Every structure is written in structure tokens, then in C-alpha cells.
Amino acid sequence: MGNKKKSVGGKINFLELLTFIQFLTHKLTLTPPKPHLFVTSNLQASIWNWPSKSRITEISKAIWMNMIKKFKIFIFFALPTMLIVKGIYICYDQEIWTLVFFTQNLVKNFPFFGLRLFNMIWVESNLGVEASNLGVEAPKASSIFLDLHLWTLMYLFGSLARIFGELYYSDFELPAGVGGESCEKKTPSPRGPLTLYKKGSDSGASGGSDSPPSAKGNSGASSGPNQDRLAPETDSEDETTQTDQGPRSRGYRKTRTRSMVRRRWIRDKPDWVEGLWTRSSTEGVENLDATKASQTKSAAENLDAIKASQTPKSAAENLDAAAIKASQTPKSAAENLDAAKGSKSKSKSAVKKAAKAAKKLAAENLDAIKASQTPKSAAENLDAAAIKASQTPKSAAENLDAAKGSQTKSAPKNLAPITGSQAPKVKAALAEFLGIETSQLQTTAVVRELATKLEDDLPGSLDFADQENGNKIISMLKLREFALQENNRYRSTIYKSLGQFMDPESHKNLKEILDKLEESKNLLMTEGQKHKNTFDRNSQQNTAYNFKGDMKKYLELQNKVQHSQMKNFKLAESIIQKNIQREYKCKELKDFLHQEFPTSCRDFNDQEMKLKKYFLNAFNQAKTKN
């Protein structure tokens, strides 16, 4: 019997797998392996208990086949599943359920070159169309695919170069530095860069600080950790030593570290640096003084306004509180805040002492503010307080209700409240946008008049000879349906946008009317398509049917829908005119509506002229042939 060939997928123990990994490692790093790791015969394998060369080949084949199997599973099952699930999630998240958007996400999320392929198919193709429209030569498809292949090769070779660079980094020679001796093959230690440290308390830990040095430190009089930083350095072998990084770190020439260069620069810094630091400090103090002055001035103005609007008793109380708040400078406020935060750790006596000092400072500033008021301003404030105190309880209650009502109203975003004198302007702005009814309904009125005139001329039955006339009649009615639909759509969109300026109850009533308009629009669209399909089917088959009765039903449906739309339009406009908030700027409201609908009105007017011309021509031709 012949020798049976061992199966490639046999069992592999852990020792064999470890040996195979070591074998591959030595092969890749091009370093000679140890004698017992590479065996050439089964005898040596039995002596050293290592797998033979044939077994190593079988192990490599088994690993390779297993990798191919896993790769096939990933390519044909795992990757498509992940791409499809992610594409569906993105469509759900963006609420865009189109095949093009789903395909774009599949291509974009493909590993390695998916994003590049997406840009090539959709982005660069659109640029090519725009270039052809502008008369510029667009990139060819062959060059785009070549660019894709080159990009993929660059990515793969870049990854391989990075891997081999890390493997063979230790085999490169280091060039000689400036002023240093050329060295033979020296390799840096993988533990970290070579560092120099000074003997003493400062070993370079504090030398990496980027904070600017103080003026005091330049004279060399500072002590503590910064004393060694500002001390002059020497290049002698006694003061600088090398850290022991192993045998591979020997032979390095001495180099200055970052901290040593910074120390020398601080020691020998030019005069303009000191002047720059001094000037910046002076400017900061001046800016702080200006800020304090502006805050004190604004606080005094606010204090006068508060005093003028309050009764004598409440004015005195709020005067004390405002003066205490205004008298605190930013520095004193910060100090008081720190004192309040640290009150848990401080003793009670210290807290009481700080509170007493703050109260004393506030009292002094209050006296200064009171003394700074002129007799005239004090008299005016007293008169204002007396006028407010003389109000009857009824008028005070009315003013209180008015103030509460103005606070409960919520203003829309990007719109500021206005005074009552500007309310008519807001009303005029609304009338301007709601007055579009006249120009928009002219189209439907003309169509309705033409359809009424043609109603008596509709033939009772249709044969092949009347097909052209029937096409014009059904086209006219379809155009009237289109005009009704556009009028409904445009006005409903305006009503929906104006609803954001209304109170919730009125907005709810307006939404019910908008739902009715949507129902009428859908009804007209569905029934109109049915009549059109009936006409097309009978005209193609050249069969007689009650064309006049069918068109009358279609016309009655249009009249019914138009009557319902007009009724709902008036209800919606009355709700808007009665309940929209009047305290918003007229210009901002107009800008908002113009921004939302910049060309709808103009497009409708252009469409109106075209429809009028077409309807008149169709009417004249139909009357002439009949």
C-alpha cells in the first residue's frame, strides 16, 4: 500500500504554532535563527523535539487555507451585511429612502477605496457635467480609473513601507552631527530618547516648563526649584552625564536638550524681551482700570433708573443692595467669592472678619454714591416715587396685569418686540401677503368662465373625428385643476408659516383647516386622474361613451372643490388676522416671508399669463370648429 498523504488541515499543537511563528519572524527580519529553531530532517526533529521542515510546510499551508476561508466569509457575507445594515440605518437616520442615496452609502462605506470611488462616480462626474456646460474639457473616465488604481497602490505600498521601516529601523546608520565625530553603526535604544540631566536637585523635570520667567528670576536671586534652572551651565564632563540606555546607546555625542537651551536663553535674554513683558503687564493694569471705571459708571446709571421707578421705601432698600453690588470691583468680588467658597475650611472668626470688612467697604461706597447725586436728580427721583405711590389700587392692579401679560408672551426666534404705534404697519404687512388672493384667483376665475361657456358645446358622444376637440377640452379642465392645486399649495404653505406667530389654540384651529385643504387637494387629484384615464382609454380604442356627462361630473367636482377652498381660505385668514401677535417688527416679518417664498408670487403671475393665453386660444379654436 502506498503512503497516504497527510491532510493539510491536521491538528496543530501550540508548540508547533509557536515554532512556526518564530521561524517566520526570523525570515522577515533577515537575522540568523538559533540552531535548534530550524531543523532539516526528521532525525533532528526527534532529537530536539521540534517539527520537521515538511511539518512546517503543512502548518503554513493550513494557516494559509484557514486565512483564505475566513477572508471569503468576510468578503461574501460579513462585509455586505455590514454595508447593507449601515446603509439602511443612514437612510433611516436621514429620512431619505431613495435607491441612489442607499447606493451612495454602500459605495462610500466600502473599505480602503470606497470614499475615493464615491467621489469619482458622483462628485467628479458632476464636476465634469459642469465643466462641459462651461465649455471646459472634462476629465476622461480612463484617467479617473487610473487615478483610483494609483491611489490604491500608494496606500498599499505606503503601509508596507511603514512596516519594513519599523522592522529595519535599527539597521540604518546615523549621520554625523555638526561639529561631532562620525560614528560607526550606532542604533538608538527603543526604551526612549537619550536625555541629559544635571547632578543636583534639578534633573530636568522642571526644565520643560513653557511659562515666562519672572523679572526677579533674571538676577539669579531666586531660590528653590527655579534656582538650578537659571544657573549657568557648563559643557564639562563632570556636570553632565549620560543615562544608561544599554550597550546600543554608547557612542552618542553630547547634545543639548530642550530645557538646557531654554535655560541659556532665559539667562542671556535680550533687553527688548524684558521691556515686552513689562509693557504687557502695564497694558493689562490700564485695561483693568478702564474696565473698573466703565463698570462703576454703568452701575451708577442703573442705580438712578432703579431709584426713579420705585417707592421711597423700596428705593432705599434696593439702593443699598445695588450699591453693595456696584461697589465691588472685579478684584474684591473675586476675593469675596473665594472667601465664600473657602468658608468651610476657614475658621468662623475669619469668615466674620471678612464679612465685616466687605460690609464696611459697601457702606463707604454707598455714602459716596449718595453724596455724588445732585439736588435736582434727588428731587426728580422723589417726585417719581410720589407719583407711583399716588396710584389707586385699581390702576396699580391694571398695570400689574399688563406687565404679567407682556411677560407671558413668547417671542419667535430672531424677531424683536415693537411698540404699539407700529402695530398698523404689521397689519399692513399681513394684508400685503394675504392680499395675494385677488391675483391668484384670477386664473381660476378665467378658467371657470371658459369652462361654463363650453359646457353647452360639449358633445354628447365622442367619435374619432372629435378626438382633437376632446383633447383640448380635457386639457383645459386639467389646467384648471392644476391652477386650483397650485393656489391651494401656495396659500397653505403661507398659512403654515404664519402659524408660528400665533398662540397654541389658534394654531390648532388653523391646522384643522390646513388638513381640510389637503383632503380637497387629494380628492381633486385622484378624481381628475380617473376622468383623464377614462378619456384616454376610450379615445385610443375609438369607442363611444358619454363624454359630456363625464366632463360635467369633472367640472362639478372642480366647482365643489373651489367653493370649499374659498371657504377654508377665508376661515384661515380670519384666524390669522385676529390671533397673530402684533408686537413684532413689520420689516422682519416681511423679510421672513420673502426669504421663505422668494419667487412663488412671481412664478404664479407668469403662469397666470400663460394660462390665460392658452385658454383663450383653445376656446376660440373650439368655437370655430364647432
Swiss-Prot record:
Keywords: Membrane, Mitochondrion, Transmembrane, Transmembrane helix. One of its GO terms (cellular component) is mitochondrial membrane. Residues 179-258, 309-351, 390-419 are annotated as: Disordered. It is a single-pass membrane protein. Residues 202-217 have a biased composition (Low complexity). The chain crosses the membrane at residues 71-91. Its main location: mitochondrion. It is found in: Mitochondrion membrane. This is Uncharacterized mitochondrial protein urf-N. It comes from Neurospora crassa (strain ATCC 24698 / 74-OR23-1A / CBS 708.71 / DSM 1257 / FGSC 987). The lineage of its organism: Eukaryota, Fungi, Dikarya, Ascomycota, Pezizomycotina.
